[in-house]
Every structure is written in structure tokens, then in C-alpha cells.
């Protein structure tokens, strides 16, 4: 019986799973969207959504809790200064999982894209300005 056993094991040890989701969370918060398997995307939501909720609280304790998960001061700064303000007034549903039509070549795994529903506004104009110069 699987009573009170939440989360998928994904055929990995607990330390491997922790490292996997830490790296995936870093990638999602850095790039805004990533392509992965459906199962990993759905499990990643359980890590990223509480991080964005911490960013909405925006106090020192929340920053320290986010650093525990992310392990990067630059990413914590980006989370609290850029990503968090984009979600002010939103009470949940910070990420979206979109299933892709074609499975992965090789092992036929179903693929999905996980993305942030609100992209930080400060990013895009700065990149376009750099490209124009």
C-alpha cells in the first residue's frame, strides 16, 4: 500500500533526486522554460511553486529558505527581485506544464515543457537592446 507516500522516486536515490530537482529548478528559474519528461515536469512543480511563494513573502527568512533549495545567491536575487514581482496578486498556478506531441527518440518517453506563467518584464527589453547595438 502506498499510503502517505507522496512524490515519484524516478528510479533514483534520494540524493540523486534532490540534485536532479535542484538543477532543474535552477534551469527553470534561469531560462523561464525547460523541456523534460512529463513526470519530471509534474514533480518539478512541487519544488518551484513554493519557491515563488517564498519570493512573494520577500523577507530575510524566505531568502534563506530559497537559498537552501537553490544554492546560488545570484539566482535567489533574481527570484526575489525579478520573478517574484511578476507574480504579485497571483495566488497560485505559477507554472504551466504543456505536453508535447512527439515522444523522445530512443526511449519513447512522453515529453513536456514546463514554463513560468508570467515572465519577468525587465528581461526582454534589455536583451533586445543588447542585440540591436
UniProtKB/Swiss-Prot annotation:
Entry-linked HAMAP family: Ribosomal_bL17
Keywords tagged on the record: Ribonucleoprotein, Ribosomal protein
Keyword Protein transport recorded: no
NCBIfam families, alphabetized: L17
Any one Gene Ontology cellular component term annotated for this protein: cytosolic large ribosomal subunit
UniProt organism field: Nitratidesulfovibrio vulgaris (strain DSM 19637 / Miyazaki F) (Desulfovibrio vulgaris)
Subunit structure: Part of the 50S ribosomal subunit. Contacts protein L32.
InterPro entries referenced in this protein's UniProt entry, alphabetically: Ribosomal_bL17, Ribosomal_bL17_sf
Protein name in UniProt: Large ribosomal subunit protein bL17
One Gene Ontology MF term: structural constituent of ribosome
Family: Belongs to the bacterial ribosomal protein bL17 family.
SUPFAM superfamilies xrefs: Prokaryotic ribosomal protein L17
GO biological process per UniProt: translation
Amino acid at each position: 500500500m502506498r499510503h502517505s507516500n507522496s512524490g515519484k522516486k524516478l528510479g533514483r536515490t534520494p540524493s540523486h533526486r534532490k540534485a536532479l530537482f535542484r538543477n532543474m529548478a535552477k534551469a527553470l528559474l534561469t531560462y523561464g522554460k525547460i523541456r523534460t519528461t512529463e513526470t519530471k515536469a509534474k514533480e518539478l512543480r512541487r519544488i518551484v511553486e513554493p519557491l515563488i511563494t517564498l519570493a512573494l513573502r520577500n523577507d530575510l527568512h524566505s531568502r534563506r529558505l530559497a537559498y537552501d533549495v537553490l544554492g546560488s545567491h545570484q539566482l535567489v536575487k533574481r527570484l526575489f527581485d525579478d520573478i517574484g514581482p511578476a507574480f504579485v496578486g497571483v495566488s497560485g498556478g505559477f507554472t504551466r506544464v504543456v505536453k508535447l506531441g512527439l515522444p523522445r527518440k530512443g526511449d519513447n518517453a512522453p515529453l513536456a515543457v514546463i514554463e513560468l506563467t508570467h515572465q519577468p518584464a525587465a528581461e526582454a527589453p534589455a536583451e533586445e537592446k543588447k542585440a540591436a547595438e
